[in-house]
Amino acid sequence: MTRNIGLKVKEPKRECEDKNCPFHGELAIRGKLFDGKVTGSKAKQTITLQKDAPVYFNKFKRYARGKSSIHAHVPGCIDVESGDNVLTAECRPISKSVSYVVVEVRS
């Protein structure tokens, strides 16, 4: 049985026993949502995302490409590979560098 997490996303088909899953565990979603591209998925239940955002330089009156990398937790009920576009949501800190959780795989 899946929990309503308050977002209009597709629920995963499988169930998991992960306590840090927003659908089947006790993890609450709060704060920011963003799309990102998975650049690394070698760690256990953790991925690295690249977030692209334009940065405005007032001196030149132009935008430049800005990039930042963020670590996110992957619940056991969601399959993610490198190169996928995913939707992540902010949550409480799971570890030192992980404060986001994957909610949906977009492609």
Swiss-Prot record:
Q: Which Gene3D superfamilies match?
A: 2.40.50.1000
InterPro entries from the xrefs? Answer: NA-bd_OB-fold, Ribosomal_uS17, Ribosomal_uS17_arc/euk, Ribosomal_uS17_archaeal
Instruction: Spell out the molecular function terms from Gene Ontology.
Output: rRNA binding; structural constituent of ribosome
Q: Which domain of life is it from?
A: Archaea
- Is Magnesium included in the keywords of this UniProt record? no
Report the function annotation for this chain. One of the primary rRNA binding proteins, it binds specifically to the 5'-end of 16S ribosomal RNA.
> Sorted alphabetically, which PANTHER family does this protein's record hold?
40S RIBOSOMAL PROTEIN S11 FAMILY MEMBER, 40S RIBOSOMAL PROTEIN S11-RELATED
| Quaternary state and interactors | Part of the 30S ribosomal subunit.
Sorted alphabetically, which HAMAP family does this protein's record hold?
A: Ribosomal_uS17_A
The protein's matches in NCBIfam families, at most eight in alphabetical order, are given as:
PRK08572.1, uS17_arch
This protein is called what? Answer: Small ribosomal subunit protein uS17
Naturally occurring in which organism (per UniProt): Nitrosopumilus maritimus (strain SCM1)
